[in-house]
Amino acid sequence: MKEIKVIIAGPRGRMGHEAVLLMERTEHFNLVAAVDYKHGGEKISDLPGMPALDTPIYADLHTCLEEVEADVLLDLTTPEVGKQHVTLAVERGLRSVIGTTGFTEEELKQLTETAKEKAVGTIIAPNFAIGAVLMMKFSQMAAKYFQDVEVIELHHDQKLDAPSGTAVKTVELIRQNRESKQQGHPNEVEQLKGARGANVDGIHIHSVRLPGLIAHQEVMFGGDGQMLTVRHDSFNRASFMSGVKLSIETVMNLDHLVYGLENIID
């Protein structure tokens, strides 16, 4: 396979660290630069626990793009920074794979239009774990037969957004096969505000944040005399790397924006 030159934004994070290791062990990936506002001017090898790579680190993406030629930006930063990075990448005609979440419908619409106008491949993935993508697809299928559903997503206590992008995407897919329906008693009253979680067309989403967790989600469907639970667990961040690899390889052949890995797997 032809070499793919990659820039990683956010190499110090746990996902970023796994992505650097992925670059090192994948023959056709070439990590040409990284972006980290705290370590501009250093090298990947200068960061604790990193492999001995001479890859330069830039303090900001704009400067990096002025000095480095790349094929793909892999962004694993925070929601706000990720939004800035993907906007800049699309405007510059650089393909990007975005692992941050928190995009609004309007932001996604604008990015989709710009990516189409520039004919630049972009993938925004709420979850890179193939198992999580299958969980979402299975939940979408089940929604045809079970109209009563609630979502419980559980993540580590350092996660910045709630609900998770995976939960939001799951509900979006379920809604495609389910008419709006209020789940629970029509006259129910929350004795404590928020006790029933977020409500999207009658689908309740509950967010749990605790140390010891990584990324987990249960989609619970209820019916007369039965329940169906679809669950996925990521026990470490290595579980996301197969999806990262697939996304980087796939985005090279795209000329538009794709939201969600379920749209690129068979």
From Swiss-Prot:
Q: Which organism is it from?
A: Bacillus cereus (strain ATCC 10987 / NRS 248)
| Summary of the function given for this chain in its UniProt record | Catalyzes the conversion of 4-hydroxy-tetrahydrodipicolinate (HTPA) to tetrahydrodipicolinate.
According to its UniProt record, this protein's enzyme class is oxidoreductase
Cellular component terms per the entry's GO annotation: cytosol
Which named protein is this?
Answer: 4-hydroxy-tetrahydrodipicolinate reductase
Catalytic residues, chain numbering? 155, 159
Q: Where in the cell is it found?
A: Cytoplasm
What PANTHER family does its record include? 4-HYDROXY-TETRAHYDRODIPICOLINATE REDUCTASE 1, CHLOROPLASTIC-RELATED, DIHYDRODIPICOLINATE REDUCTASE
Which Pfam family is one of those matched by this entry? Answer: DapB_N
Q: Which reaction does it catalyse?
A: (S)-2,3,4,5-tetrahydrodipicolinate + NAD(+) + H2O = (2S,4S)-4-hydroxy-2,3,4,5-tetrahydrodipicolinate + NADH + H(+); (S)-2,3,4,5-tetrahydrodipicolinate + NADP(+) + H2O = (2S,4S)-4-hydroxy-2,3,4,5-tetrahydrodipicolinate + NADPH + H(+)
Q: Where does NAD(+) bind?
A: 10-15, 99-101, 125-128
Q: Which pathway, per its entry? A: Amino-acid biosynthesis; L-lysine biosynthesis via DAP pathway; (S)-tetrahydrodipicolinate from L-aspartate: step 4/4
What's the EC number here? 1.17.1.8
The residues that the entry says bind NADP(+) are: 38
| Gene Ontology MF terms | 4-hydroxy-tetrahydrodipicolinate reductase; NAD binding; NADP binding; oxidoreductase activity, acting on CH or CH2 groups, NAD or NADP as acceptor
Q: Could you state one GO biological process linked to this protein?
A: diaminopimelate biosynthetic process
Q: Which UniProt keywords apply?
A: Amino-acid biosynthesis, Cytoplasm, Diaminopimelate biosynthesis, Lysine biosynthesis, NAD, NADP, Oxidoreductase
Q: Keyword NAD: yes or no?
A: yes
Where on this chain does (S)-2,3,4,5-tetrahydrodipicolinate bind?
A: 156, 165-166
**Family the UniProt entry places it in:** Belongs to the DapB family.
